[in-house]
Amino acid sequence: LFNKICETPEYYVTRTEISLLNNNGTEISALIGAASNVMEYGCGSSLKINALLSALHEPAEYLAIDISHEHLIQTAKSVAKTFPAVKVGALCADFMEIVDLPNKFGGTGKAPLLFFPGSTIGNQTPGEAGQFLGRVRNLLGANGSILIGVDLKKDKNILNRAYDDAEGFTAAFNLNLLKRMKNELKAEVDVGSFYHLAFFNEQQSRVEMHLVSKRAQTITFEGSTFEFLPDETIHTENSYKYSLKEFSKIAENNGF
């Protein structure tokens, strides 16, 4: 579902990020240097890493990191086939919990580069984002660097449409949480009695996603019961938006 969201005309993030990588490859390569050791958090698709590795001068290694074993192996195999001169590795893990890199990674001795595209950093609060960057700094060492995707503040109508596409893929993605609760946690929930809501909260500078109850109802699972009034919501996700100045300050305060 998320891959379908990325292909919708409303969701600008993916195509814009790929365009940025393609159009600024020379500058990015000059900053990173030759024989780089690249690792990627959340390697769901090979499109972006292909654009980056194509721009870099003789990249030495690529380490794919993802919690989904299926996506991880698929991406690693694809990159290995496309870039036969690059040493490719794969680590199935939650990147939020990584504290050490595999000993075999970074054999060239060059400081690692973390590639973290997709504006995933926006799903954390600004405070959490700072803590995350601090952990990454410790992981990469003093000379390591990060190439990160950050979504900037923009017209709220553009943001609202991006998280509520006309084809309904984002709505299905959000409602899938209830389906998984029902199927995997054996929750008693009527999925059809909720609907998707997304809007830009200007005061908090974030897009919020909610599941809204259409009626008075209860959800029961694992011995607990949750009562909902009509129009009461489950707040499922945030996506914070920054100015360049705001995010730069967070990065600088946490070692970058």
Q: How does the language model describe each region?
A:
Residues 2-32:
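Class I SAM-dependent methyltransferase Rossmann-like catalytic core
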Residues 35-44:
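Conserved class I S-adenosyl-L-methionine
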Residues 45-58:
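Conserved SAM-binding loop of SAM-dependent methyltransferases across substrates and taxa
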Residues 68-69:
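Conserved SAM/SAH-binding beta-strand->alpha-helix loop
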Residues 109-133:
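A short SAM/SAH-binding and catalytic strip from SAM-dependent methyltransferases
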Residues 130-142:
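A short glycine-rich, Lys/Arg-flanked "PGG" loop and its adjoining helix->strand segment in the class I
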